[in-house]
């Protein structure tokens, strides 16, 4: 599984005119299931995402996770957006191949599992809508962006 995470001041996702998710300071995570991924991979990626230290401590060092963005225990928001294009194979030609991505039904199942697990472990979780044409807006903080990937 893959997550492209961005530290944000705020972010939201819309489907048409409807806002499906919105957060203040926290992490926007574009999430993709690859062929062969399992719930164990989703759990491993979520643990990495929730524990990844990308927020600054009092000394200005990236040393705090999304569960404690200010060093005083305040949790940041987590906006999870499905994006199968992260699994694209771009090694040949001028058109990406999406064969490495999980099939839509499996991708949705794993994304829904990931979201449910995140909601059990983190107080502020918002989402996009799987398979929808979404408009994602964000104010990137830094910018700070990381590619997280785990194998099943």
Curated annotation (Swiss-Prot):
- GO CC term, one of those recorded: cytoplasm
Sorted alphabetically, the keyword list is: Cytoplasm, Hydrolase, RNA-binding, tRNA-binding
Q: What is its EC number?
A: 3.1.1.96
In alphabetical order, the GO MF annotations are: D-tyrosyl-tRNA(Tyr) deacylase activity; Gly-tRNA(Ala) deacylase activity; Ser(Gly)-tRNA(Ala) hydrolase activity; tRNA binding
Q: Which reactions fall under this protein's catalytic activity? A: glycyl-tRNA(Ala) + H2O = tRNA(Ala) + glycine + H(+); a D-aminoacyl-tRNA + H2O = a tRNA + a D-alpha-amino acid + H(+)
User: Top EC class per UniProt?
Assistant: hydrolase
CDD domains from the UniProt entry: Dtyr_deacylase
- A single GO BP: D-amino acid catabolic process
User: Where located?
Assistant: Cytoplasm
InterPro entries with a match to the protein in the record: Daa-tRNA_deacyls_DTD, DTD-like_sf
Q: Which Pfam families match?
A: Tyr_Deacylase
Q: Does the keyword tRNA-binding apply?
A: yes
Domain commentary:
A Gly-cisPro motif from one monomer fits into the active site of the other monomer to allow specific chiral rejection of L-amino acids.
Query: What family name appears in the similarity comment?
Result: Belongs to the DTD family.
Q: What is the annotated role of this protein in its UniProt record?
A: An aminoacyl-tRNA editing enzyme that deacylates mischarged D-aminoacyl-tRNAs. Also deacylates mischarged glycyl-tRNA(Ala), protecting cells against glycine mischarging by AlaRS. Acts via tRNA-based rather than protein-based catalysis; rejects L-amino acids rather than detecting D-amino acids in the active site. By recycling D-aminoacyl-tRNA to D-amino acids and free tRNA molecules, this enzyme counteracts the toxicity associated with the formation of D-aminoacyl-tRNA entities in vivo and helps enforce protein L-homochirality.
| Quaternary data | Homodimer.
Protein name per its UniProtKB record: D-aminoacyl-tRNA deacylase
Lineage, uppermost ranks? Bacteria, Pseudomonadati, Pseudomonadota, Betaproteobacteria, Burkholderiales
